[in-house]
Amino acid sequence: MVNYVLRKMLGTKNERELKRLRPLVARVSELEPRMKALSDADFPRLTAEWKQQVRNGRPLDDLMPEAFALVREAGVRALGMRHFDVQLIGGAVLHSGRIAEMKTGEGKTLVATLPSVLNALSGRGVHVVTVNDYLARRDSEWMGRLYRFCGLTTGVIVHGLTDRERQDAYHSDITYGQNNEFGFDYLRDNMKFRLQDYVQGELNFAIVDEVDSILIDEARTPLIISGPSDESSDLYYRVNQVIPSMIRDQDFTVDEKSRTIVMSDSGVEKMEKKLGVQNLYDPNAIETLHHVEQALRAHHLYRNEVDYVVKNGEVLIVDEFTGRLMPGRRWSDGLHQAVEAKEGVKIEAENQTLATISFQNYFRMYSKLAGMTGTADTEAEEFAKTYNLDVVVVPTNKKNVRKDSEDVVYKTEREKFGALCDEIETRHKKGQPVLVGTVSVAKSEVVSSLLKRRGVPHDVLNAKHHQREAEIVAQAGRKGSVTISTNMAGRGTDIILGGNAEMMAKHEVGPEPDLPMEGEAEESFLARKQEWARRLEETRERLRGQTATEHDEVVALGGLHIVGTERHESRRIDNQLRGRAGRQGDPGSSIFYLSLEDELMRIFGSERIQGLMSRMGMKEGEQIEHPWLTKAIEGAQKKVEGHNFDIRKNLLEYDDVMNQQRRSVYRLRRMVLGFGAGVPVVEYDEEPKTRKKTRREQVFTWGDQREHVLDLIEDLVFDMVGASCPNRLSDWNLDGLSSMVKEQFGVEMKFAPPSGKAADARREIEEQVYAVVEKAYRQKEEELGIGPDGEPVLRRYEQWLYLQAIDQQWKDHLLSMDHLRQGIGLRGYGQKDPKQEYKKEGYEMFVQMTWRVKSAVIGNLLRLQLVRQETAEEIEQKRLAAQRRAMQRITETHAAAAGDGEEKPRPKQETVVRTQPKVGRNDPCPCGSGKKYKKCHGATEAAV
């Protein structure tokens, strides 16, 4: 009651926020006459002046009204588009690092230009993240006209670019790109052998378009870079041959809700007999068990034409959220190979993880993150908890008049498809455009074949026909058009009633000439380009009149009609489909046709809904519309959303452990690459509670590298002496210490029996060993001499050996962590919290890994023997050749949705875990603070 009264008096939080932003809109409008008076040349001049002012310390917030007013006028001059007042509000929300919920058709693409120009003034880059390559290209070219008018540069990151092209794109003021490409560039950069080969630069400010799709829907699937392992494909074929003999509900059970399969005792016995294995659960047969489980999942959970398609002898994943094919992406953990065996195509080698990151942890690295979408408010809590992002609902420019009908439900799919085809045919005959939304490729093909039989002309937009995507969507609002789409989320092209004259003109005229023909003179090529531009403008003008007339006719018919063939597992996706109609105050309507055989109803809501329908006395062939039913269906969707949220939360909790380790390793790697590079290494320190980031940069010299290597030697000596010389003198093992020193450092040492206090004697031995090893290090330095750059040659070998050690040990550590993750679920049976166990053991394994890195670097360094003195250039070429070899063998994948199956132990190699791990005192602390261990957790533990 109190909250209700306060809301009435003060307004909701969203209303208060909108009220707070209105003075900004008024100020921008006041500045409009001043901006109109500027010449075109004044725009880049003002931008350059503001850049200098920001460098001199002027806050961006201080410049916001002027910058927004400049961008608004630039939009008019460069694009013929003026930002509405509500778009200015959206721009301010994005600049403040929040999510702007703006309905479909409200011009989100144009809104992004406001904070992009303002934040580009910092000179530290702005990334605009889209859901596909087409939108990245389109928006960078389209909005690029506005940016260039303001004197700013634009780049685009899409699949297939070279590193040089990527560097150029990232060096632009504003960079557009697809979400996966940004994440993979980060991972690839941290596998490079020179800082100058990094492409991405700083993660300063990101604006994520369709933010709910990228940061929530796709957050279940981490990005993985992997390389081929040595495993044979024979076992996949053998297991696949015997899977058909397994009988569902007798030999195994399938839980489609949790996407898991469990074998019964009879199923296990059958597989053991068929495969000639004595005990599938024997540690030596655990790999075979894993193959069996993945083969069962491939046969009974992953379906052709729904989860993947087979094209040109290759299994291509279908993105479940957008319906697009994902060439080059593979499911991990042997699942993709199991599907290949099932479909009878060539099995590609299974890959080992080399680098991985979740979308949550990638995007949380940005200093400032913002997003925009038509549907975010329903997920506001998750955005706040996971990304520290608030959602502001921006009002529409014109009132939404779309009519949304209650769902119509039938008992069977056959009845449902018949009824919805009747609806489509009736609307088509009237001339009203219809957009049909389906949840899979297979369902879109079913609707298409039914409409063909009725003679209803239509276009199909799914993973098989995505090449014509923009063209099809652009014409979906034309009179009499029928368009079938697997998923309208993120399609990104507005459906304009009467047709899109711009897209129609481009289709009619054809693509712009981009390269001269063989032997063609430059004058001829330029003339061809000019002729193309003339024809495009001529065609555009002709079509504008045609589409304007058609627009009025379609409005009179009721606008675009949306027909949903099934409820998606997320209410947001349904709302996005509905949101395609009724843009900018246009009329429109929507209705969903459902059946009890639909996947969502069958798995999550069938019994309750069937009971409701039985009580209403529904018979075969009858339809029902009722608010109770709509609520029950929404309840089923909420169940799925809750389940998916748990999966994302689970993934994040596990990945947070890896994230701290990954950031620590990558930070160390960048420091090593920075030694002697002469360029600053930029790092961000994050305050854990607020996630506020502090930027710092540091230049590392060759002298810093020498100091660092001596620190590593000190750490190793400290560890060895500590292990051999505990607190009781009677437990000392000096012979063992001599052997360890010989093995690690290659030097002979004998130690006299200790006397006095153990601590003093131990310190004396530490100093003895360190002095001997430091002398051996200096001798190695003198032996290799001074290079042409005036620095000891040893420096470059140190750096090379250090990078090799980090990369090899990190790769092995990722494999060990994979195995730990797969088996950790069984700890629950022993009354232990699997996550806590994973965190504890993962930390211990990480500590061991850092010790192995130090041991490998120093051991190899002191044993280094050169047959021939190599130049710095030759050493550099070796590193680059190794980098090229590594990059040629990698594969980028989206993992199968985390949580798709039960976690099972799958040890390929045994990991020895010390019970009392020691971190080197000068190592980066594994907690990810960026401090040395001895000044962070090391100091705490020493005090204890």
Curated annotation (Swiss-Prot):
It is a peripheral membrane protein. Belongs to the SecA family. GO terms for molecular function: ATP binding; metal ion binding; protein-exporting ATPase activity. It comes from Anaeromyxobacter sp. (strain Fw109-5). Pfam families: P-loop_SecA, SEC-C, SecA_DEAD, SecA_PP_bind, SecA_SW. May bind 1 zinc ion per subunit. Monomer and homodimer. Part of the essential Sec protein translocation apparatus which comprises SecA, SecYEG and auxiliary proteins SecDF-YajC and YidC. This is Protein translocase subunit SecA.
